[in-house]
Every structure is written in structure tokens, then in C-alpha cells.
Amino acid sequence: MRILVEIAYQGNNFLGFQIQQNGRTVQQQFEKLLQRMHKRHVRIHPSSRTDRGVHAIQQYFHFDTELNIPMSQWQYAMNRTLPDDIYVNNVVTVDDDFHCRYDCVGKRYRYKVYQAQHRDPFQSGLKTFIPETLDLGKMNRAAQQFIGTHDFTGFCSQKTEVESKVRTLYQSEIVKTDDGFDYIVTGSGFLYNMVRVLVAFLIEVGKGRHEVSDVPKLLESKNRKNVPFTAPAEGLYLEKIYLDENELLKDFGNDIKIHRKKSLQND
């Protein structure tokens, strides 16, 4: 039987989602829990592999089990033993050919920034602090330039190992908040550090160090050295996973291009 689990977690005290040789990860917490239940190793398969310090409001993984536990009890059984910085929101059965990664057709990230004269210790790890005044309108105009299908070679980590760095963004916008702004981006998939590089670039635009008109040129150059900054992980949230293409079409229109993850790698 294949089970799909929806979870949320605060990333401050994790080295990321994926198992690391030394260190605490989200995958490690769940596989340790499932091993106790099954008396054997059970591998989980996530929709996304968040990095160290990145939070998730909605994340999914699936695993296979032979245990005859009522579906209504899985959530309780997991939450009673999980640490306080992880929570299981829902557990359902899925078809045996369902795959959490390959059936994912889109993801949405939100990057949270607060602006003030002084750093707020109560925001530490949850939002990124920027004391400078930024031109949010200009930043939003630059953000809109990323919507569509582009080669994001110049806007991801040089450690990205995948062959194709072409991704499609359905949404890319700056939204003003009471204490700063959020950057919201939805796409077919994301390269390693791509969202954080986009945020860092948009902040440079807000400071007047780049222009809106620079975006097409930087995309065309495919040179990471032209965008050398990466925003901190602490303000980044994996906000939504699209497992249903109809939901994606509902949010962004029937004309968008749907990508299947069997042709994409990374993120």
C-alpha cells in the first residue's frame, strides 16, 4: 500500500530535508519513526528537497507499507512521536504508480523580508532582515520579467548538476506587507538555490544597483558571475505543492504549459 503524507516544518534546526551523513534532517526524523513502526528501513520519497534552514508550509512525501493501520490513525501515530518543529497535516492512500516527485507539476515558494531600523530577535530564522529602503515597485517590475520559460543558468548555484536549466515560472511578484515585503514565485520546478538567487537579485534592483531592463540580458548571458549574491535561507518557505494539474490550471489559466517531472531534475 502506498501512502501520501502532507507535512509542515520549521527549518531552523534541520540541515535540510534530505538525509545527511551527520546531522538532523526531516527525512531522517520520518525514516527513524517508520523504522520503529515497521522493524525495518522504510524509505520516503519527497516532492521537494529543501535546503538547510528552509521552512515548509506544505510538503509531501510517499512511502510503501504493509502495516494494517487504519488510515485515521496514521496522523496521530506520527505526530505523537515527532519533534515540535514538524507536524503531519494529512495522510491518505494513493495508487501504487503514484510518485511524489514525478507527479508534482508545480511548486510555490514565498520569501519573507522585514524592514526596520534594528534587527528583531523574534523574527530571527523566520524572516530576513533588510534595513535599507527599497523600491518595491521597481522590484516587482523586475520580478515580472522572470515569468515564462527561461534558461536560469545565471540564477542558480554553480553546484547545480542537472543538464537542462530551463524552467517555467507562472508567478513572480513582490507583495508589500506590514513590515516589509514577500517575494512569491510559482513554477514548474526550481534549480538549486534558484529562488534565493532571484531574491538577492531583486533586492539589488530595489537598491538601485540593477535595472529592470537588465533581466533579459542576464538571462541571456547565462553567467552566474553576473548575479553573484544568494539571499539567506531563513526567509524562504516552500508554500505549496501542486500534485493536480487541474489546480495549477485553475490558478494560472488553461494556456500555461504543464511540465512533467520525469523530464526535470533537481529541486
Curated annotation (Swiss-Prot):
Cystines in this chain: none
Reaction equation(s) it catalyzes: uridine(38/39/40) in tRNA = pseudouridine(38/39/40) in tRNA
EC annotation from Swiss-Prot or TrEMBL: 5.4.99.12
Residues holding substrate: 109
Active site as annotated: 51
Subunit field text: Homodimer.
Protein name: tRNA pseudouridine synthase A
Gene: truA
